[in-house]
Amino acid sequence: MTHLDHLLTEAIELFNRTEDLAELEQVKARYLGRHGQLTELLKGLGKIPPEERPAAGSRINQAKESLEAALSRRREAIQEKKLEEQLIEEKLDVTLSGRGTGMGGLHPITLALERIQSLFHSVGFTVASGPEIETDFYNFTALNIPESHPARAMHDTFYVDDENGGASEHLLRTHTSPVQIRYMESNPPPLKVIAPGRVYRCDSDLTHTPMFHQVEGLWIDESANFSALKGILSDFMQHFFERDDLPVRFRPSFFPFTEPSAEMDIGCVMCKTGCRVCSYTGWLEVLGCGMVHPNVFKHVNIDSQKYVGFAFGLGVERLAMLRYGVNDLRLFFENDLRFLKQFN
């Protein structure tokens, strides 16, 4: 057993001098491997007298357990030292300023929409919203749009099939005017409200997309008149484009839900004499407007003998294109960062 004590002391000393895990495994194999010195002692138990085997076997197993414990401690010590060295090497100076990350920005349509809402809110308009899937009544009938009107045709409107795939009275709203109908049903006049939101029409080209954004406005009280309508819209356009000298004009037009009706033009913001944007006329059509038709009031139980009102509707993408000088509407929907970063 003297040899065993010497072997144990020698192995532990070698373990403690080892500084590398790979080298430690080699030392382990030397003493505890399949052909290791301690393993050979266990194999040699058959050569000693039977009465001495139990004591010898117990002593060898104790030595083996001691070596395995020493090996485990040394392995942990090497790993801890290696981790400490790695942490020191990779130490970060937390007092240094961080690396800047790219800042996002609002989409140009969002910028234009927020500007429109802010300008109308500044003169007392409330913002209202409503469902994008509407019924035939709110989208057409309540707005004095008869069944024979072209807007009801399949090629102009996205209709939603019923559960069985048949015809349905539901559709994707073609304007945000239904929001105004719903608002009038639950809010007695006087009132001033704008209805921004997405609308849908079967159209797609350089200046139209199947989905776009509109803001429609409504003012109802006992003294609303066309003069006030012209003043509010003229003032809005001058502030939106930040041009006090922006010329405007109103042309007679027709909309089923207003009478009289008009379309508003502004002087071309791209030129002064004529260009491709304004078709060389010097004018740009920007919105439709008019005095609310009595039949619309009738559908929402408002006394048209007591109250009068005016309404208007404008396309957000249209104004954004003019404000930012964009010549293709589809650029707003392609999510090209080269385009969007220009508005940050």
Curated annotation (Swiss-Prot):
Keywords: Aminoacyl-tRNA synthetase, ATP-binding, Cytoplasm, Ligase, Magnesium, Metal-binding, Nucleotide-binding, Protein biosynthesis. Its main location: cytoplasm. Binds 2 magnesium ions per tetramer. One of its GO terms (molecular function) is phenylalanine-tRNA ligase activity. Mg(2+) binds at E259. GO terms for biological process: phenylalanyl-tRNA aminoacylation. The keyword Cytoplasm applies. Its cofactor is Mg(2+). CDD domains: PheRS_alpha_core. The keyword Cytoplasm applies. It is found in: Cytoplasm. It holds the Pfam family Phe_tRNA-synt_N. It catalyses: tRNA(Phe) + L-phenylalanine + ATP = L-phenylalanyl-tRNA(Phe) + AMP + diphosphate + H(+). GO terms for cellular component: cytoplasm. SUPFAM superfamilies: Class II aaRS and biotin synthetases, tRNA-binding arm. Its EC number is 6.1.1.20. Signal peptide: none annotated. Belongs to the class-II aminoacyl-tRNA synthetase family. Phe-tRNA synthetase alpha subunit type 1 subfamily. Tetramer of two alpha and two beta subunits. NCBIfam families: pheS. This is Phenylalanine--tRNA ligase alpha subunit. It comes from Nitrosospira multiformis (strain ATCC 25196 / NCIMB 11849 / C 71).
